[in-house]
């Protein structure tokens, strides 16, 4: 009888490894947490304590979290939520959270953002601006940006297809499995498949080129998976924001999380949560106050990718080799190993680094943690659209400023060639005028009107292991041309200051590509065929 009951809550009833499949997240987390405080098996705990009391999980968490403040147990329950129709300002604030949450956001590459709702383009209309004298100006500026974007989608797709005709590319012939030019394909299914690959990659290219026109108010969707502790912190951060949108999102997210992991997020708005919100506001205000007295504004125009902090390669190599040897060393301290490593000849040290470089046979073979001991800081100012891609990397320190029009914007060459440079500049100039007018009274809300093409200042500090992951990933052929170039510049600058250590980044692609998505679309189509 017990086995029958357990089968609905655990993947098996007698093995020593099993999945917890009981429906309620709060019970799953409470079972794991309770597990650490008894010598009973988890299935026994479930039968003895949870089966007869459907509120047992919540009661347990209320006691542990509220009475003892044991934060770590809030990591044992997870939830998945979807947020639709939030701005690109709010989604970046959410995605600033690095630990315990995973995100998947609507793409600006695969989806055109030209749809209207009730006759209006889909962008966020901030309530503070809506009730101000700037309401019409804001509406007109965002609408104009969308109009220029929307009316040029088809012309840009046509231009891309003219510049990169399908006849120029090779596709797989299903009969002999060889790559052949499009004109040489005979099989109807192969021709259809080739057209699908070509249409997908050319549309992606066109949308990549045009995305700079989109304002930060553009509405997007994001899915989030995370644990209770991380969600609680997210709610605290959003609640402390000066933006109404982010405050309202905090309330909506909390309401929905209460349907699945209520006990984990209860404290986000209690007296401790309110105190934490006040602390976050105080930190921001104190920083703003000190900065206004000590730092003079000095905005630079144009894009920047510059390494500004690093250590000597000699010291860096010693640290990495010490860490490589630490795990396998015979009961020897880090300090002692370091002293011994310093006595190894330079050539021997280079050879050691090269040995570990040889072991990597693809980019997913990450360097070991030893390579986390060396750091680089980059001063960056790139278009906001590109920043959104780099922002996804979280195993690093990233600080960023408010989005403004102070640093100029980038124009893709294709915009000029297609003959829409004037339209593009008109949109940028209109944005700048509106932004400058609104920012005096609403410095935070004025961000919404700024286009993705405008340059955005931030800095990133990361270790060599993360540099390897970030740069190799962001230089893959299918990447957006903007972030590929920045990642390539990062590699060149690291290579200049650390020519030996940078060898570990052996899968950096320094080439330029016509249709970035083409080869990737081909691989996807091959996989699709195998699934049929």
Which residue ranges define each predicted feature?
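A conserved ligand/cofactor-binding region detector
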Residues: 1-532
């Amino acid at each position: 009888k017990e086995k029958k009951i357990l089968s609905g809550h655990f993947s098996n009833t007698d093995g020593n490894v099993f999945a917890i499949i009981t429906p309620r997240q709060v019970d799953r987390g409470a079972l794991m947490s309770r597990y650490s405080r008894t010598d009973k098996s988890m299935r026994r705990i479930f039968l003895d304590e949870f089966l007869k009391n459907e509120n047992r999980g919540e009661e347990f968490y209320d006691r542990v979290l509220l009475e003892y403040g044991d934060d770590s147990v809030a990591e044992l329950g997870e939830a998945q939520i979807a947020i639709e129709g939030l701005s690109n300002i709010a989604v970046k604030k959410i995605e600033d959270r690095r630990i315990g949450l995973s995100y998947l956001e609507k793409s600006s590459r695969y989806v055109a953002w030209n749809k209207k709702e009730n006759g209006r383009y889909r962008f966020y209309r901030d309530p503070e601006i809506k009730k101000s004298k700037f309401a019409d100006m804001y509406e007109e500026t965002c609408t104009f940006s969308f109009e220029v974007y929307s009316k040029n989608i088809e012309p840009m797709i046509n231009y891309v297809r003219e510049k990169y005709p399908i006849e120029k590319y090779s596709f797989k012939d299903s009969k002999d499995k060889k790559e052949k030019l499009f004109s040489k394909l005979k099989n109807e299914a192969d021709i259809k498949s080739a057209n699908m690959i070509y249409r997908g990659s050319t549309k992606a290219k066109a949308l990549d080129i045009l995305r700079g026109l989109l304002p930060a108010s553009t509405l997007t969707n994001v899915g989030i998976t995370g644990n209770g502790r991380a969600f609680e912190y997210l709610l605290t951060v959003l609640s402390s924001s000066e933006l109404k949108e982010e405050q309202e999102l905090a309330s909506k997210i909390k309401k929905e999380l209460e349907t699945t992991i209520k006990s984990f997020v209860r404290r986000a708005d209690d007296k401790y949560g309110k105190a934490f919100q006040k602390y976050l506001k105080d930190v921001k205000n104190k920083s703003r106050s000190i900065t206004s007295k000590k730092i003079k504004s000095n905005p630079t125009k144009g894009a920047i990718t510059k390494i500004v902090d690093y250590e000597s390669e000699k010291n860096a190599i010693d640290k990495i080799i010490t860490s490589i040897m630490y795990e396998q060393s015979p009961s020897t301290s880090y300090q002692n190993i370091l002293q011994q490593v310093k006595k190894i000849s330079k050539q021997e040290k280079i050879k050691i680094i090269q040995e570990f470089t040889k072991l990597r046979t693809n980019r997913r073979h990450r360097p070991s943690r030893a390579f986390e001991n060396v750091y680089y800081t980059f001063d960056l100012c790139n278009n906001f659209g590109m920043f959104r891609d780099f922002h996804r990397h979280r195993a690093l320190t990233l600080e960023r400023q408010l989005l403004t029009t102070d640093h100029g914007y980038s124009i893709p060459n294709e915009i000029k060639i297609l003959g829409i440079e004037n339209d593009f500049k008109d949109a940028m100039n209109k944005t700048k005028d509106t932004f400058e007018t609104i920012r005096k009274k609403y410095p935070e809300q004025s961000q919404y009107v700024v286009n993705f093409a405008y340059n955005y200042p931030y800095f990133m500090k990361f270790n060599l292991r993360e540099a390897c992951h970030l740069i190799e990933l962001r230089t893959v052929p299918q990447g957006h041309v903007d972030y590929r170039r920045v990642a390539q510049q990062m590699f060149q600058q690291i290579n200049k200051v650390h020519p030996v250590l940078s060898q570990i980044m052996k899968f950096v692609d320094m080439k330029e590509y016509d249709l970035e998505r083409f080869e990737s679309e081909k691989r996807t189509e091959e996989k699709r065929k195998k699934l049929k």
